[in-house]
Amino acid sequence: MAGTPQPRALGPDALDVSTDDLAGLLAGNTGRIKTVITDQKVIAGIGNAYSDEILHVAKISPFATAGKLSGAQLTCLHEAMASVLSDAVRRSVGQGAAMLKGEKRSGLRVHARTGLPCPVCGDTVREVSFADKSFQYCPTCQTGGKALADRRMSRLLK
């Protein structure tokens, strides 16, 4: 929240960063953008579900290298962060605790929608699983039609 002091272990609140701030936070970072924007020490307030939504709106692959995003991609990412998170806050205002999870799900386009059509282009929403995490994305909107490798079975094949 704006004006609320942040604990030292957290990065700046996702709704408080400017495009220039975001560029500075990502500069030189060799991590995958999905991992970087969910790292609360880098940017606070973005979890797994909303990172999927933000990257979908921004049309950025979850596997893109954070520090190599173009200026246009940074602008799209910043705008997507603001719109997705602001919309989530608007939808949750006045909701009781029992209703929050359902309200959150009602606004999701790709997260937890594996196998369903993308609401933007109609392609099938895909999932990549690795370790104890997974993410959902649209190949057409985010990766130029390329399906990303699912790491779910790779540890069993070694």
Curated annotation (Swiss-Prot):
BP term (GO), one:
DNA repair
Query: Where in the chain are the FPG-type zinc fingers?
Result: 109-143
A cellular-component GO term for this protein: plasma membrane
Keyword vocabulary terms for this entry: Metal-binding, Zinc, Zinc-finger
Show the InterPro entries listed in the entry. DNA_glyclase/AP_lyase_DNA-bd (IPR015886), Ribosomal_uS13-like_H2TH (IPR010979), Znf_DNA_glyclase/AP_lyase (IPR000214), Znf_FPG/IleRS (IPR010663)
| Any matching Pfam family | zf-FPG_IleRS
Q: Which domain of life is it from?
A: Bacteria
Molecular function via GO: DNA-(apurinic or apyrimidinic site) endonuclease activity; endonuclease activity; hydrolase activity, hydrolyzing N-glycosyl compounds; nucleic acid binding; zinc ion binding
Please give the PANTHER family that the UniProt record associates with this protein.
Answer: FORMAMIDOPYRIMIDINE-DNA GLYCOSYLASE
What is the protein's given name? Uncharacterized formamidopyrimidine-DNA glycosylase-like protein
